[in-house]
């Protein structure tokens, strides 16, 4: 089977189970922490792929990575099932699929604003309000500081990207000069 098919099946099952128990929000928060742990700590994935490590140790590692050892019963049972079925190498993809499914179900958009310096909270609130007005859903914003922009900002939401950075404008002017001088 393909990674995507397996991951999506397990993610749908986790979402249905969490919905049934009324803990989908808690599981979503824990899944976000776990996904972040997978990206920050490559050794976590290596430990899960290790066939010598017992399932109990892997369960403890995952619970620790998902919330300091205190995770919801639903996520814990899900991880136990994944370990029992020996599908732990797909766990990262299952968690990412769960996050995507949850966001679709709750109509949550993820936006990112990249600037040279920190953005005031009131500016982020105004942008969030505009996006909520257009999407009729909830918006999760991340802000990133990148000194290479030299000024301006880059705004991303879903597949839409607005690049109003000085670095991008300089790049466009440079391309126009090159095109005219050929």
Predicted region positions:
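Elongated, mostly alpha-helical coiled-coil "stalk/stator" tethers of large membrane protein machines
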Residues: 1-182
